[in-house]
Amino acid sequence: MVAIPLRIMTADAHPVFREGLAAILSAQSDMALVAEATDGNQALSLFRKHRPDVMLLDIYLSGMSGLDVIAKIKNDFPNARFLVLTTHTGDAHVQRALKAGASGYLLKNTVRRYLLESIRAVHHGQRRIPSEVASNLVEYITAEALTAREIQVLGQVANGNANKIIADRLSISEDTVKAHMKNILSKLAANDRTHAVTIAIRRGILELDAVAS
């Protein structure tokens, strides 16, 4: 009896990377690539059409983020399996992906080493987080998380705004902004405002697109 191959779908903005994934998958007798999406909205639509066994996707997709794609699909298809493939190593990125419903999180530069085993494991209901990713989680596992308001304040700092402007934009007092900044520096073990922004971006607490907006 011939085994039915795993039906795989990919979602990534970069055509060269998608082509690489397609080449790897095509060499496997137990896997078949059924769809490729280039943005978040297309990913959602193609998933509903093809119902793949495992979806490989990046965090950052135009139109709708990869994490939103996962959350929306999980809402309608609780048993859907997702494996995130990305360049982002921050612990906050990983935590958000797992919370959204991803079962695995791989860095793109480790795909050749871990991809096939991870796909098979995720399909069987297991989680796959390689040591390169897990080490970041472990490093900050006891760190106190920033509150939503603290992230708002730090985002304003990242855009170069002074305390008075931040206070006006968030409808709070300058003293409150200063208190938030004191907490932020302490939680991130940062030396100053710039250092805090750098740490937050590296860890994925602040998103680059949000900083630029």
Walk through the language-model features, giving the residues of each:
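Acidic catalytic/metal-coordinating carboxylates
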Residues: 39-42, 65-68
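The feature encodes the CheY-like receiver
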Residues: 62
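Active-site residues of response regulator receiver
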Residues: 58-59, 86
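Conserved acidic segment of CheY-like receiver
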Residues: 4-17, 21-25
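Short hydrophobic/Thr-rich beta-strand motif most characteristic of the beta2 strand and flanking loop
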Residues: 30-38, 46, 190
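Basic, Lys/Arg-enriched C-terminal extension of HTH/homeodomain DNA-binding domains
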Residues: 186-213
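Recognition helix of helix-turn-helix DNA-binding domains
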Residues: 162-195
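Short, flexible helix-to-coil linker/hinge segments that flank and couple to helix-turn-helix
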Residues: 92-99, 103-152, 205-208
